[in-house]
Curated annotation (Swiss-Prot):
Bilayer topology annotation: Peripheral membrane protein
GO biological process: aerobic respiration; electron transport coupled proton transport
Family under the similarity heading: Belongs to the complex I 20 kDa subunit family.
Summary of the function given for this chain in its UniProt record: NDH-1 shuttles electrons from NADH, via FMN and iron-sulfur (Fe-S) centers, to quinones in the respiratory chain. The immediate electron acceptor for the enzyme in this species is believed to be ubiquinone. Couples the redox reaction to proton translocation (for every two electrons transferred, four hydrogen ions are translocated across the cytoplasmic membrane), and thus conserves the redox energy in a proton gradient.
Annotated PANTHER family: NADH DEHYDROGENASE (PTHR11995), NADH DEHYDROGENASE [UBIQUINONE] IRON-SULFUR PROTEIN 7, MITOCHONDRIAL (PTHR11995:SF14)
Pfam families: Oxidored_q6
Major localization class: membrane
Cofactor(s) it depends on: [4Fe-4S] cluster
Reactions this protein catalyses: a quinone + NADH + 5 H(+)(in) = a quinol + NAD(+) + 4 H(+)(out)
Name the record gives this protein: NADH-quinone oxidoreductase subunit B 2
Organism: Sorangium cellulosum (strain So ce56) (Polyangium cellulosum (strain So ce56))
Length: 182
């Protein structure tokens, strides 16, 4: 896959223009440039934590192997929720396990993203009529990207990771941290 990112070209809005927000604060396009740079760095260093519950977790392991190579997109596995940006839930989620998923999600620092991988974690899948199965991870925590399939192919998970990277790039990093001009 090729990237259309040109690191040599400055981002849009680099021209020197000054705006006032009416409160006496003058913002320049430097804010936009720093915002672009922060989002570029965050989107290309996504650290994920896997919560594998069933056969979809095997597909994630295959994606992390030499053929899928998640690390070429900047994604690296982390064992702790405190050091991860992305939470990948793969497999059938039961109500008993849902409290642990919520606890792990709450331990992640902002900004945090979630990929629901496979039919079982998206909607309950084959086991959706069982009394103990949660009918989707989105009933417990907010989900950013759904990866369909039973089990999904490694390419589908890579596409989901690219969607997360696009979402990170479109955010406003400076405004979220309370800096001026945001």
């Amino acid at each position: 896959m090729t990237s259309n990112l040109n690191l040599m070209a400055p981002p849009r809005g680099w021209e020197a223009k000054y705006e006032s927000d009416g409160g006496g604060v003058i913002t320049t396009s430097v804010d936009q440039t720093v915002n672009w740079l922060l989002n570029w760095g965050r989107s290309n260093s996504v650290w994920y934590m896997l919560f594998g519950l069933a056969c979809c977790a095997i597909e994630l392991m295959q994606t992390g192997g030499p053929r899928g190579d998640l690390e070429r997109f900047g994604a690296a596995p982390r064992p702790s929720p405190r050091s991860s940006d992305l939470f990948i839930i793969a497999g059938t989620l039961t109500y008993k396990m849902a409290t642990r998923v919520k606890r792990l999600y709450d331990q992640m620092s902002e900004p945090r993203f979630v990929i629901s991988m496979g039919s079982c974690s998206n909607c309950g899948g084959l086991f959706q009529y069982a009394y103990s199965v949660c009918k989707g991870v989105d009933q417990i925590i907010p989900v950013d990207v759904y990866v369909p399939g039973c089990p999904p192919r490694p390419e589908a998970l890579l596409e989901g990771l690219l969607k997360i990277q696009e979402k990170i790039k479109s955010e406003r990093a400076l405004g979220r941290r309370g800096a001026t001009g945001g």
